[in-house]
Structures are given as C-alpha cells and as structure tokens.
Amino acid sequence: MSARGAERASAWAPAALVFNAFVWGTSWWPLRHLQAHGLHPLWTTALVFALACFTIAAVRPKAVGQLLHTPALWLLVVAAGCTNAAFNWAIVIGDVVRVVLLFYLMPLWTVLLARAVLGERLTRRAALRVALGTAGAAIVLWPEGQGSAIGSGAVSTVEALPVPRSLADWLGVVGGFSFACNNVLLRREASRPEEGRSLAMFAGGAIVAGALALALTAAGSVAPPPGPAAPWLVVLVALTVAFIASNLALQYGAARLPANRTAVVMLTEVVFASLSALALGGGALTARLAIGGALIVGGALLAALEPGR
C-alpha cells in the first residue's frame, strides 16, 4: 500500500469505529420496535446472530472448522453469548442510559479477570480504575431517597445498599462482566484466526440467547415468535446487516489504530446511547446518574489511556 493509501486508511479507521459504536449505542431502538411487534429481545438476538453466523460461514467456510476443532473458542462462545443476550434484553426493558453505564463497569471486571486468568499484576492505575468504577456504580445504584430513610429507621441498611434491584440492572451488570470475560479471552486467544473468533462470538449470541428464549418460552415467561410479517422481518434483516457491518468496521478500525485509541473512540457508544435515549424517550438523565456515569466513564477512559495498550 502506498503512503497516501495508508494515510487514507488511517483516516477512515476512527470513522469505522465510530460507526460501530453508533450501531451498538442506538441498537435499543430497533430492538424495542421488534418487541412492540411481539418479538422478545432474546428471540431477536438469536435470529439476528444466527443469520450473521450463516453469512460468515458462507463467506469464510474455514471459520466453521476452526470453531468446531478449537475448544478454547467455546468459552468465547459462552462469554459473547451472555454479553449479547444480557445487554440486548436489558436495553429493551430498562432505562437505556442506566443500563449502558452499568454495562461499562467492564474495566472493573477486566482488572479482576486479567489478574485471575492472565496473571496480570494489579497496578496503582488498575486499582484506581476499580475505585472509580465501584464509586460510580454505587452512585448509580443508590436507591432514591434512601439516605434520609436510613437515619429515620424507615428502612433497613440492607434495603438501602447500592445493589442492582431490577432485572434490567442485573442484566446490565452481567452483560458488562461477560463482555470483560469476552475481552480477556480474546486477548488470550489473539493468535487464533480472526474469522474463527468472529464466528465464535456470533454463534454465542445465537446459542445462548436461543437457549434462554426456548427455556423461558417453554416456562411461559416469554412469548413465542410471531408469524412471519413484513413489518418485523424487514427490521430484523436490517439489524442483522447493521451488526455484520459494525463488526467489519470494528475489525477494520482496530487493525489500523493503536489499542488505546480504539478504546477511547469506542466510548462514544455511551454518548450515542445516552443522546438517542434522551431524544427518543428511552431513558432519563438525572444529576446522580450523570455523576455516577462520569466516574464509570472515567474508569473506562483511564483503562483506554493506559500506557502500553
């Protein structure tokens, strides 16, 4: 590639990453649209990721063999599947801004998992990331009006603890933890072919979300998918194309930018999610949420700017 071509490719790389962040940051809207047409987010995730798997297998058939014959990638299937099933479900049933912020506790989990799985040393900077994430989560999760209630004895100390209380909160936290597992496993399996890792992540979304959808449908907790109809099929196919395109954009951008710059650009997902949610009625921004969110994003930014990344 010529110097001019390399410079042009480098210039497009940040735009590709911003596109990826935009797709994921605004994905809550089509997911809620599909929910309104009777398609639960778990069924949506399973169908979208299954279509993506078939597409990858058709374009890169070697990826299928790599996945089937590499047990190490099976853990990636589980981690990626839990990430997408939890996150997509959470942003449909919960406040989008709150869910995305809880999801971005990921740097906190990454520090702990990198220590346990990769044997990485816990540095002062890493400890600061944990402290920022923990403080931010405590502020976001602190129950409304509970501070004065504790002093008056109206509620117990346990009831006033800043812990997830709704299903959406728990799914946001679980999604972020699973994404941290996903990232640690990707680092551990960095020598594996890229198409095998990509297929593993898409297969995880299809398998985990599909299994949960089947189990909850059998239990009567989730409605079965509606009959084929243009209003939701068109959106489903469009969402599949968007997710595949965003994955390609992520690979393009991440391959051409340093990891720290990639991580910083990817934080724009929080901006896209927050602005779209506030504009379209998917969430609300309170002062407490803004303060807690600033600490959580600060921890993520500190992780992104860590030397040597």
Question: Which functions belong to the PLM regions below?
Answer:
Residues 17, 21, 25-33, 56, ...:
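Transmembrane alpha-helical segments that form core, pore/gating elements
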Residues 2, 142-143, 263, 267-309:
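C-terminal-most transmembrane helix of multi-pass membrane proteins
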Residues 12-13, 23, 37-82, 109, ...:
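Transmembrane alpha-helices of multi-pass small-molecule transport proteins
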Residues 56, 125-144, 150-156, 288-307:
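Hydrophobic transmembrane alpha-helices of multi-pass small-molecule transport proteins
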Residues 100-105, 189-205, 243-279:
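Helix-helix packing/entry segments at the starts of transmembrane helices
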Residues 26, 63-98, 103, 139-140, ...:
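Specific transmembrane alpha-helical segments of multi-pass solute transporters/efflux pumps
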Residues 60-62, 106-128, 271-291:
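C-terminal transmembrane-helix exit sites in multi-pass transporters
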Residues 12-20, 63-86, 166-175, 223-245, ...:
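Loop-to-transmembrane-helix transition segments
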